[in-house]
Amino acid sequence: MSYKIDRNTYAQTFGPTTGDRVRLADTELFIEVEKDLTTYGDEVKFGGGKVIRDGMGQSQVRRADGAVDTVITNALIVDWWGIIKADVGIKDGMIFEIGKAGNPDIQDNVDIVIGASTEVIAGEGHILTAGSIDTHIHFICPQQIETALASGITTMLGGGTGPATGTNATTCTPGSFHISRMLQSAEAFPMNLGFFGKGNSTNETNLIDQVEAGACGLKLHEDWGTTPSTINSCLNVADKFDVQVCIHTDTLNEAGFVEDTINAIAGRTIHTFHTEGAGGGHAPDIIKICGEKNVLPSSTNPTRPYTRNTLEEHLDMLMVCHHLDSKIPEDIAFAESRIRRETIAAEDILHDMGAFSIIASDSQAMGRVGEVITRTFQTAHKMKVQRGPLSQDSDINDNYRVKRYISKVTINPAIAHGIDKHVGSIEKGKIADLALWKPSFFAVKPELVVKGGSIVWSQMGDANASIPTPGPVHGRPMFASFGQSLIKSSFTFLSKNSIDQNIPNKLGLQKKCIAVENTRNINKSHLKLNSKLPNISVDPQTYEVFSDGELLTCEPLDEVPMAQRYFLL
């Protein structure tokens, strides 16, 4: 006999289904479930008197015969490819299937077999996203990694050697010695890591040495001299060894202007950091480079979104990060040339248009490592409030906008750096790096983080309590953060050449090392939902930004969501 229940009761029991809408945190963003892959009346749920019991939702199938290791039940998946309700099966640390879980002996259309070997994570009423990827890391202190993990980041790419003066300013791990030591250090952390070598050298041998030592990319930074000749040399090596080049261009325009940099790049693929310019780059018009097809443009989070405090905080940040002296007028002028209200305001709109494709942190070097996802969706909220629904959306949901913005911190950085085969989205066959969120805490604090198929971080109450929930509840490392589980659950990204030369074994690395690939034959059109190529111009006197002749401007926000009410301590 069938039994009908109202939508509200169903959502409270099994989570929202097709047509239901969910508000994201305290923003004005609303998502609507596009499709439900579970089966009405045949849903699986764990608990006393519930479905996942032996002979009911749990089958007799052994692990060796197809039962999964873990199932996340009734989760609301938010990814670039859709917003759907589904069960997610995990096996051997990989995403095994997305669909309907259960017992095929008594249930129809079962994609994910639950057996005695299967653990359950209750996804009902929760949002599931891929673990996010931060591709602009200054590895200044190891404590960044825990902070990033607590925010839902599961992959960090960048450069540095610790709190050295060079690392405080630039995302470079220079030379084979430092690359080797950072790769060895990566063994200690429950995070996917990869390191950029220093790309500033006209002698290509210096760059080749770093790629062969294990660098997964090269970084050009103006503080080391980003001239047309170093740009050309760096890209030559990248093309030969299939690694990505990231660039922080010449703010002072000493070696040329933005047009000269574009000419030096010569149509080759490159990832431009803080493309608006406050983080550095040709003043005042580096922002126009986002209209080039071969450029993969990203932002860093201190300018995300534009608020009444954005300009004021930047000057001091910049002086510290780039080792400038407030007693020297030229240093002050250098700093002030990078901070422009007009280009920061335009950056908001360019993100909303899909012309800027990636958001990262710039950790401890003008950016906040634990706020990448939060600031991404604060920007989305601001644009919804100021610009209204996107043309692809309706008055009742913001699905396209949300998918556009989640892409900026998941799949697009993965594509840009040649790791999208492994991470960056919830798709069959990829590493099970996942973040589970209560909708009220979406993009602020994940309820738990799964790393390589094991729980690595979770909101957790008092360890001496009789149940897990009594306060104080806060994020804490879980078992996949320790011992050999850490080694098996996290990965290190290197150049293919270094893996071919057996660098992991020579350095005694235990983590699985994965080669980056397909970084040189991509362009902006490969980036998901963020591939617009506007014709950008900047007025050299007023700094006003125009896209295809239209002025791009917006007002700063006085108050953002996902802020004080979530961080009272």
Curated annotation (Swiss-Prot):
The Urease domain, residue ranges: 131-569
Cofactor(s) needed by this chain: Ni cation
Disulfide bonds: none
Active site (catalytic residues): 322
EC number(s) stated in the UniProt entry for this protein: 3.5.1.5
CDD domains membership: Urease_alpha
Binding site for substrate: 221
Keywords for this protein: Cytoplasm, Hydrolase, Metal-binding, Nickel
Intracellular or extracellular location(s): Cytoplasm
Family designation: Belongs to the metallo-dependent hydrolases superfamily. Urease alpha subunit family.
Name of the featured protein: Urease subunit alpha
